[in-house]
A protein has these predicted regions:
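N-terminal chloroplast transit peptides
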Residues: 1-53, 58
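Short, intrinsically disordered, low-complexity terminal/loop segments
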Residues: 2-4, 74, 550-551
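Residue-identity detector for glycine
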Residues: 17-19, 65, 79-80
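Compositionally biased low-complexity segments, especially N-terminal hydrophobic helices
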Residues: 36-42, 48-57, 61-62, 70-84, ...
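Short, low-to-moderate order helix/coil transition modules at the start of elongated helical scaffolds
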Residues: 64-68, 83-334, 339, 343-344
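Conserved beta-strand/loop scaffold segments within soluble protein domains that form the structured core
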Residues: 222-502, 516, 520-551
């Protein structure tokens, strides 16, 4: 059920309450300690003032006081030792954190120096950020439902960046690209000139370049430094930044307002051999910067897939860690479609940062069906009036899969709008869906309209969804709604469809296939791409014995 809010809503009151409780407890402890010391001192002084007749009692009292003082000193020494031990433990934990972060960085890319000033700036910034970071665990709120130990406890093995054995796969991917579309291709996170459309001089449409200069050289790698929108997921974006190189970064500049502008970004991941238990292959960390100039328009289509050579997909163990930064100038429009179909042994962490200026529009439609663990940190900040943001996501979690979306939208200006629709199907008892969506409407964001809804479908018993939609409203002239539903297939809906002469199996198939149709239908990139996405959903469901008998 959706609920509306028109008043300020923050969590500061509960935090203040916790602070007061903590302060009261500390004062109570001090009073108890002081009272004990007074009693001890009083007893000792009284015994010192006794008459000669009570000398024996005085000696006994002094002895007890001496013993008590000895115990107090011992306790103090023990406390000091405990403090030293805790300090040593903290230092040890920090050392382990640093060791893992360095291991992750070194496994992703070699550490040779670069003559590019923007590369050195990004690496220096990331080094400082990571020195203040700690390795995430399930004890951290942001990682409670994501088994991050799959990454942090694994032995990371750097994968060969060679493009061998991917030719047939890439040809198959490119066959679905509409005529006239530009292509940006990455193989194991490394930019591929062979399969990309490098065109740095296109002054009227869309240019693709590996040369980072001007305003982009200043902006790239800075969006994760905004503390207002950033969360604990930033550590992987910062590892990506620490691995910056000129050959794992691509820049897309959109200059034309032609609505037919299309850019395909293909992320092909492969592992040349099976990995031992506990090993996780990794490669370069891809980063894309999209600069949509004033009044420009573009459709960006991203496709993630595991390739195994000879056109065959296989489930190899690897970790992909990518970042996309998008800047929209005034009146720019970006339609973003994303399909993630990694193999079911892969781990994928991704961050998307969006900055929107006045009257711009950003829309994403993403479908995630692959990977053993998938985490998308999506951060959007509106930087001007009349800005429009649409975030649409369909996740499918099957056997032993976790599909996790963490999003944050910041509205800072008047008459902004945002609409977030999240759908998740969990088709296995060992599958898990996670949604943590945050929308913050700041004080100056008057006359805004913010909507957020998450709908989750559990197809089997013991399937799990952890959903937390969150609206923080500080402005007082707004229209905001949010809601959350978690359910299995409704018997009434099944009965209604069966009453039309269809079998229960077809009725079930209709309801399941229709659950994510709204998101898929909104994708750009042509009908071939949409059909590809539908097939990935159908294939993923079939792995968990959920057959779609209708298209």
């Amino acid at each position: 059920m959706s609920s509306s809010f028109t008043l300020a809503s923050t969590s500061s009151s509960s935090q203040n309450g916790l602070g007061k409780t903590s302060s009261f407890s500390s004062k109570s402890s001090l009073r108890r300690i002081s009272r004990r010391r007074l009693l001890s001192s009083s007893s000792f002084d009284t015994s010192s003032a006794t008459t000669e007749k009570n000398n024996s009692n005085d000696t006994k009292t002094k002895t007890r006081g001496s013993r008590r003082a000895t115990k107090t000193a011992a306790a103090a020494a023990s406390g000091g030792a405990a403090t030293a031990k805790a300090s040593k433990s903290s230092s040890s934990l920090k050392k382990r954190d640093n060791e893992w972060i360095l291991q992750a960085r070194d496994a992703c890319v070699s550490s040779e120096s670069s003559s590019e000033s923007w590369v050195e700036r990004m690496r220096s910034s990331a080094s400082k950020q990571l020195s203040e970071s700690k390795t995430p665990t399930n004890r951290d709120e942001s990682w409670r439902f994501f088994d991050v130990s799959e990454i942090t406890s694994a032995t990371l093995v750097r994968e060969d960046d060679s493009e061998a054995d991917v030719e047939e796969d890439m040809k198959a991917f490119l066959a679905d690209v509409p005529e006239g579309a530009k292509v940006v291709a990455f193989v194991n996170g490394r930019f591929s000139e062979k399969w990309s459309s490098i065109d740095e001089d296109d002054k009227n449409g869309v240019s693709i370049s590996r040369t980072i200069s001007g305003d982009i050289a200043t902006a790239i790698g800075t969006y994760d430094e905004d503390e207002e929108v950033e969360g604990q997921g930033a550590i992987f974006a910062r590892i990506n930044k620490s691995c910056a190189r000129s050959d794992n970064v691509a820049c897309i500049t959109v200059k034309s307002e032609n609505v037919e502008n299309i850019v395909y970004i293909i992320h092909a991941r492969r592992s040349s051999k099976d990995r031992k238990d506990g090993e996780l292959a990794t490669g370069a960390n891809a980063r894309v910067f999209i600069d949509a100039l004033a009044k420009s328009s573009v459709s960006v289509v991203e496709k993630y897939a595991t390739v195994g050579g000879s056109g065959k997909k296989h489930d190899s163990r690897y970790w992909a860690n990518d970042v996309v930064e998008i800047h929209l100038a005034e009146n720019a429009r970006v339609f973003h479609s994303l399909s993630q179909d990694h193999g079911r042994e892969a781990v994928h962490t991704r961050a998307t940062y969006v900055r929107q200026n006045e009257s711009s529009m950003y829309e994403i439609n993403e479908v995630n069906v692959g990977a053993k663990l998938h985490r998308h940190d999506l951060r959007v900040k509106q930087l001007g009036k009349k800005t429009d943001t649409k975030l649409n996501c369909f996740n499918l979690a099957g056997s032993k899969q976790t599909q996790d979306l963490h999003s944050a939208i910041i509205l800072d200006f008047e008459e902004g709008t945002t609409d977030q629709r999240h759908r998740c199907i969990v088709s296995s008892s060992s599958g898990k869906g996670v949604f943590d969506g945050n929308v913050r409407v700041n004080k100056l964001a008057q006359r805004t309209d913010a909507k957020q809804i998450t709908r989750n479908l559990l197809l089997v018993p013991k399937a799990t969804v952890n959903a937390r939609p969150n609206l923080q409203i500080i402005a007082d002239d707004v229209k905001c709604t949010h809601g959350c539903t978690v359910s299995d297939l409704e018997e009434e809906e099944l009965f209604y469809i069966q009453s039309r002469g269809l079998t229960k199996e077809i009725a079930r198939s209709l309801l399941v296939s229709g659950f994510g149709t709204e998101i898929i239908s909104g994708m750009k990139g042509g009908e071939k791409f949409k059909e590809y996405v539908r097939e990935t959903v159908k294939s993923a469901l079939s792995k968990d014995a959920v057959e779609l008998l209708v298209a």
